Regions:
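Conserved, well-structured functional cores that handle cations and Mg-NTP chemistry
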Residues: 1-206
């Protein structure tokens, strides 16, 4: 089992309110396993890294049940985790003044009939001015906080909220998901003024 360094541990402790104590411990193990994984970072590969000292057959899934259940059954939500991440980032890096938020979407390439939320979406990286490329994957709408790192002139955009965009007319559009996340952030920081930036895809009447 890996042990986090003190500087990382202080960051992880900020996220504790989003978890129960058991799920928080599993969260730490999964995060450290992801950081230390030298192979392809699939769930199985990360879980193997966590238990690197214990050989596990690919036919035996039960040693990793606790880690698989962390994502499907544990008592935590992406919304609550995003809240704690946002608070930690704002308090430490943007405690006063305007909050500059940037929204965009990204495609995480995935295949497989068991992958949740899978769909075919425009691949912005592979597309050109004359050709629109599509690819299979999970399509995420992400809101980041643009900040100037103290002591430098560099501006970075740190993700603080994200929602999965599902393909099809029966699911919410990217703009609607962005609107919901903006509403969340307004609730989290009711005393702050926000500047919300996005491209034409997020310019809608609703």
């Amino acid at each position: 089992m890996f042990t986090s360094i003190p500087s990382l541990d202080s960051v992880l402790q900020c996220l504790l309110p989003a978890f129960t104590q058991p799920s928080f411990q599993t969260h730490i193990e999964v995060l450290l396993g992801w950081v230390m994984c030298l192979s392809r970072r699939t769930e199985y590969g990360v879980f193997q890294t966590i238990q690197a000292g214990t050989p596990v057959s690919r036919k035996e899934r039960h040693p990793f049940d606790r880690f698989y259940n962390f994502f499907s059954r544990s008592a935590w939500t992406v919304h609550d985790l995003a809240h704690q991440v946002a608070v930690a980032v704002v308090v430490r890096l943007n405690p006063r003044g305007l909050l500059y938020l940037v929204v965009d979407d990204t495609l995480l390439h995935k295949r497989g009939k068991h992958v949740y939320g899978l769909g075919w979406f425009r691949d912005a990286v592979a597309s050109t001015a004359k050709r629109v490329a599509t690819a299979s994957g999970n399509h995420w709408v992400v809101v980041g906080l643009a900040i100037c790192i103290p002591g430098t002139s560099k501006i970075y955009c740190l993700p603080i909220h994200a929602m999965l965009h599902r393909a099809g007319k029966n699911h919410k559009s990217e703009a609607m998901l962005a609107k919901e996340m903006l509403g969340d952030i307004l609730e989290w920081f009711p005393d702050r003024k926000l500047v919300f930036l996005g491209d034409g895809a997020y310019s809608t009447k609703n």
